[in-house]
């Protein structure tokens, strides 16, 4: 009997490890494929806005264009500048790409229901359901700037170094606003677990959703700056810095920066969906909408936000650098601070602060 218990515990340990490994592989492959076709979607949408055709040669409707681009980058020769620091030059894009993937460890893609002692429990479908998920995401996004700084410094190029400095100051400036907008959500939900936040937001009164709506807009604009996307793509300003911090990169090192940028776009869109747009739940609490799996709703909402990223790139001119800094420190920071105080006061006055956090591993289904 003792040997059987040892075998059973060993089997459970191995099976849980294999399941975790499979989850990681599935998420990595999904993110990589999503990045490839996000580039295709961006080229098609911008072409449609500019009354062009876009990619249409490789495969039906140009659907194989991402694979052609990948093959082109793989077979190119990586060129390292003569006076560059070779080790730092090569490790910088790896850091950026790895950190872009690490953030997905705590993103819940959906949920499933289990029955325990006759009671239905909601469990989030996530790789690591840690109780400091929000802090983990903020830490990973903050570390992303190191890859860019190392790339700019190691290239031994004035253009690359200026782009890296711009990127560092820009990301640090807007991380403050992102953090404060997330604080307003935490005040209303009372949890740092992303799965709990989604379920708590789903069960909230509509007036709290309206109260947090301005923060959703501010979070999205700050996400544009955080990911160095248009109109805040000043670190890559072609007219001034030729290409910014990645000006000396080619072949796969350049592709890793490219993949990291677009993976961060999808990650920030997923965070916005989790914090402000209901996660994997349908947009309306109507019974027939629940027929569609929650993961489909989650992906659908992310695609809508990514379309907004692309639409803004095709429509709005680039900001000047001083305007970008002024917007971050003199507009977004005071407004987000004021909104934290306002939300706190309203929640206390209406006795709507969360009374307690939910269970660490499972979530009770609301009737």
Curated annotation (Swiss-Prot):
UniProt subcellular location: Cell inner membrane
Chief location bin: membrane
E.C. number: 7.1.1.-
Keywords on record: Cell inner membrane, Cell membrane, Membrane, NAD, Quinone, Translocase, Transmembrane, Transmembrane helix, Ubiquinone
GO biological process annotation, one example: aerobic respiration
Transmembrane segment boundaries: 18-38, 87-107, 132-152, 180-200, 204-224, 257-277, 291-311, 328-348
GO cellular component: plasma membrane
Catalytic activity: a quinone + NADH + 5 H(+)(in) = a quinol + NAD(+) + 4 H(+)(out)
Subunit structure: NDH-1 is composed of 14 different subunits. Subunits NuoA, H, J, K, L, M, N constitute the membrane sector of the complex.
Family: Belongs to the complex I subunit 1 family.
Protein name (database record): NADH-quinone oxidoreductase subunit H
């Amino acid at each position: 009997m003792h040997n059987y218990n040892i075998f059973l515990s060993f089997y459970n340990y191995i099976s849980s490890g294999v399941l975790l490994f499979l989850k990681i592989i599935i998420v990595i492959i999904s993110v990589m494929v999503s990045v490839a076709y996000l580039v295709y979607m961006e080229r098609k949408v911008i072409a449609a806005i500019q009354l062009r055709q876009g990619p249409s040669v490789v495969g039906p409707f140009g659907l194989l264009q991402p694979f052609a681009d990948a093959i082109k980058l793989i077979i190119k020769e990586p060129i390292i500048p003569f006076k560059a620091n070779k080790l730092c030059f090569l490790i910088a894009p790896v850091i950026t790409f790895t950190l872009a993937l690490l953030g997905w460890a705590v993103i819940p893609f959906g949920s499933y229901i289990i029955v325990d002692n006759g009671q239905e429990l909601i469990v989030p479908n996530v790789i690591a359901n840690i109780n400091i998920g929000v802090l983990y995401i903020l830490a990973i996004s903050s570390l992303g700037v190191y890859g860019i700084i190392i790339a700019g410094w190691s290239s031994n190029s004035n253009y690359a170094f200026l782009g890296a400095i711009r990127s560092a100051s820009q990301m640090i400036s807007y991380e403050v606003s992102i953090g404060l907008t997330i604080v307003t959500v935490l005040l209303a939900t009372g949890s740092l677990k992303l799965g709990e936040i989604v379920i708590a937001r789903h069960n909230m009164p509509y007036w709290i959703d309206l109260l947090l709506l301005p923060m959703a807009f501010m979070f999205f604009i700050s996400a544009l700056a955080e990911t160095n996307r248009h109109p805040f793509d000043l670190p890559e300003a072609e007219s001034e810095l030729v290409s910014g911090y990645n000006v000396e990169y080619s072949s796969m090192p350049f592709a890793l920066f490219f993949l990291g940028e677009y993976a961060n776009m999808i990650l920030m869109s997923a965070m916005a969906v989790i914090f402000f747009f209901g996660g994997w739940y349908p947009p309306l609490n109507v019974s027939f909408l629940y027929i569609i799996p929650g993961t489909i709703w989650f992906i659908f909402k992310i695609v809508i936000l990514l379309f907004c990223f692309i639409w803004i790139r095709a429509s709005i001119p680039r900001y000047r650098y001083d305007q970008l800094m002024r917007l971050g420190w003199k507009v977004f920071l005071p407004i987000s601070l004021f909104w934290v105080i306002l939300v706190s006061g309203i929640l206390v006055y209406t006795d709507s602060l969360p009374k307690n956090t939910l269970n660490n591993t499972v979530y009770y289904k609301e009737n």
